[in-house]
Structures are given as C-alpha cells and as structure tokens.
Amino acid sequence: MESFRFVHAADLHIDSPFSGIGDVDVRVANRLREATYEAFQNLVELCLKSDVDFLVIAGDVYDGADRSVRAQLRLRDGLSRLADEGIQTFVVHGNHDPLDGWQSSIAWPEGVHIFGAAPEWKNIEKNGEIVAAVQGMSYPTREVTDNLALQFSPPQSGSIFTIGLLHANVGGNSAHPNYAPCTVEDLSTSGIDYWALGHVHTRQTLKRAAPVIAYPGNIQGRHPNETGERGALVVDVAP
C-alpha cells in the first residue's frame, strides 16, 4: 500500500452567528460575521499547503438546515480549489444540516462526494492504486436517535485502509445532544481502521490504537464557552 495523507475536519458551521457577545463595535461584528467563512478558507489552505490526498468532513458543514446560498457558494468555491489540485472531498451532513433541509441546485465539482442517508463505500486512488476507502452516511432529518454506527458494513477488503465518516455522540457526551448514539465498542468491532467523527466541538481522541477514533473539534469557536485552539487533524497513513 502506498502512503497517503488526509485531513479530518468536522463541525464547520458555516454562516453561524455568534452568541453571548452582546453589543459590539460594527467592525468587530463584521469580523465575527465572517469568522466561520475565514476558518473554512484556512481549512482549504491547510489542505493545499499540507499536500494532502483528500479531505473528510464529518457533518454540520452548515449551521442551519435551510443553508444560505452564500454559504453554499463559498463551500463550493473552496472545494473547487481543492478539486483543481486533485484533492477529493468526502462529506456527511449532521443534525444542523440534515438532508431534508433546503439547498439550492448548485453543481458540485467533480471529486466532491456527499453521502446520502444510507451508508456507502467510496474508493480512493493514488497513482492508479486504491489506497483507501471511505464509508459514510448523512442524517436524513435533524433528530436522529438510532445507532447509525451499527448500519455501517464491514470493509470489503483487508488490504486497504478504511475510514468511517460519522456524525455521532459516542459514549453519551452530556455537552451535546445525544444524536446517533453509539459506544467505543460499537466502533471498535466494525473492522474499520479510522473513525472520523463529528458532533463534539472539543478535540478528543477516544482510541489511539486500531481503530483510531477521533473528534477533531470545530474549526471556529462560536460562543464564549468555545475558546482555545480550533482546527482539523492531519493524518498520515503509511504501510
């Protein structure tokens, strides 16, 4: 297997308003209004500068189900920059941006893969060789209380690296709604090598040995309780 690199991001919440900040100067307000867009552009730059092979986004790409046209266009433009450099993107939607929300008829670039409500495998090639496969599924509606992890199918081959892309509450984290609840054990027995999770906004690695189970946290704090470093995970995989 050839080595490769990918970025694991989640909870972009593009176009999210800030809460709990009161009245601020108009210049500060404008900066805050643009903050999630700037954070997304920083994510795109990270992918380009890090020479990654692909990007996975584990849900809550947008802040609301009825996502704005502006947010969708900015997402498309950013992912187009990646596609132009041969970097594929794999996306699932979460509780903030489920599939039944409104969206405009924007044509996504080739190389952008948005998963539906049923789990599906997508192969990833590098230099003509399949090096990895991603399986993901999106929320059909906002409040998903089923254990989606149990719906993922086992890998079709043991010779390639596999990634599960899921927006879920693992272990009943009380700081977040208990959507798509599952356990570390559910994920550990799946046969998948790396679980790329979203939903929890604080970076956490729930399991470091195979399979790796990780939350990257969100890329931009959205209220006074979300402070400190934010960003995404750069993951290197070697034979």
Describe the role of every protein-language-model region.
Residues 1-73:
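N-terminal active-site segment of His-dependent metallophosphoesterases
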Residues 54, 65-214, 218-236:
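His/Asp/Glu-rich metal-coordinating catalytic cores
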